[in-house]
């Protein structure tokens, strides 16, 4: 079936009727929102090398960490600790190129991983975590590839004993970006977004074994030739909420075929619709609020918020989903 992506809306039961998509706060180039049980939203300001916080109902933001190691994707693990992908988007010395975990109660920061086979990571981008403590993160290079020590863009697993295992790499995938789990934690979803002509713009699904090994690779959705997905979230029914699209073509390698918004897609690849957001470029999305029905969307310079009908699933509040 051919879909006219520019005319797709969401049916009743997904986006709350009359709910505006409103700016929560505006900064620079934003990524990786993560929302605590109390409602505090952590998000990355990559360009200014900071992790910021936003309190709903309060104008503006607070600085949580500066410098942040060019932090990108953020996630609260099953114990409510803040996982951070410290990247290298600018190809300079401020990029941490590592995974860290912060105990928000004590402020203690722990380096979980900074290399593989003795070589520094490219630029950790996004992260997912199981309730058993396993952590999965993507490590692409979207910046200066001459800074790479590794010769591949891959997905890794950090086990509770601290060991690091490469679980996905080229040629099965090209440029891993957003990553998430299904509510039962048995499916791993991966955004493979390679912005070159004929590069992947796919959402992959993998079966995930108890020990954290992915298998059974299959396509959920292909956004080609438009701007594919970046980050994503999952609701309690298993639907994917993918930040994707762009309002105008960047050239033949990334066309304007996919308009910007949060694309709601079932695990079987059925497009339920789109929450339109006019700003380029949407980067990531998460659920928050008392009822997990508040959606926070990071974009080029604005953190947006809107309301949805189906509560989200996040690992640190899995008992509520």
Q: What is the predicted function of each stretch?
A:
Residues 1-321:
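Sequence-structural signature of mature extracellular/luminal beta-sheet repeat domains
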């Amino acid at each position: 079936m051919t879909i006219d992506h520019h005319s797709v809306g969401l049916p009743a039961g997904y986006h709350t009727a009359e709910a505006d998509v409103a700016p929560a706060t505006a900064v620079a180039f934003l990524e990786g929102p993560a929302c605590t049980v109390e409602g505090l939203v952590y998000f990355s300001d990559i360009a200014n090398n900071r992790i910021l916080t936003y309190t709903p109902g309060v104008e503006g933001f607070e600085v949580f960490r500066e410098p942040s190691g060019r932090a990108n994707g953020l996630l609260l693990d099953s114990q409510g600790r803040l996982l951070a992908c410290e990247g290298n988007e600018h190809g300079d010395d401020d990029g941490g190129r590592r995974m860290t975990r912060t105990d928000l109660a004590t402020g203690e920061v722990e380096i979980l991983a900074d290399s593989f086979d003795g070589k520094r990571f490219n630029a950790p981008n996004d992260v997912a975590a199981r309730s058993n403590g396993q952590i999965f993160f993507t490590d692409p290079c979207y910046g200066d590839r001459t800074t790479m020590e590794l010769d591949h863009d891959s997905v890794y697993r950090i086990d509770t004993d601290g060991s690091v295992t490469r679980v996905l790499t080229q040629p099965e995938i090209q440029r891993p970006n957003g990553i998430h789990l299904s509510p039962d934690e048995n499916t791993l979803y991966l955004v493979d977004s390679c912005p070159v002509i004929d590069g992947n713009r796919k959402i992959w699904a993998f079966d995930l074994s108890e020990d954290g090994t992915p298998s059974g690779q299959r396509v959920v959705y292909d956004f080609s030739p438009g701007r594919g997905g970046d980050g994503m979230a999952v609701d309690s029914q298993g639907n994917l909420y993918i930040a994707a699209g762009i309002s105008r073509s960047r050239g033949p390698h990334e066309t304007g075929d996919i308009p910007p918004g949060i694309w709601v897609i079932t695990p079987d690849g059925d497009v339920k619709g789109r929450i339109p957001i006019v700003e380029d470029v949407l980067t990531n999305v998460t659920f928050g609020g008392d009822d997990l029905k508040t959606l926070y969307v990071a974009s080029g310079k604005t953190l947006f918020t809107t309301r949805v009908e189906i509560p989200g699933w996040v690992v640190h509040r899995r008992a509520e989903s």
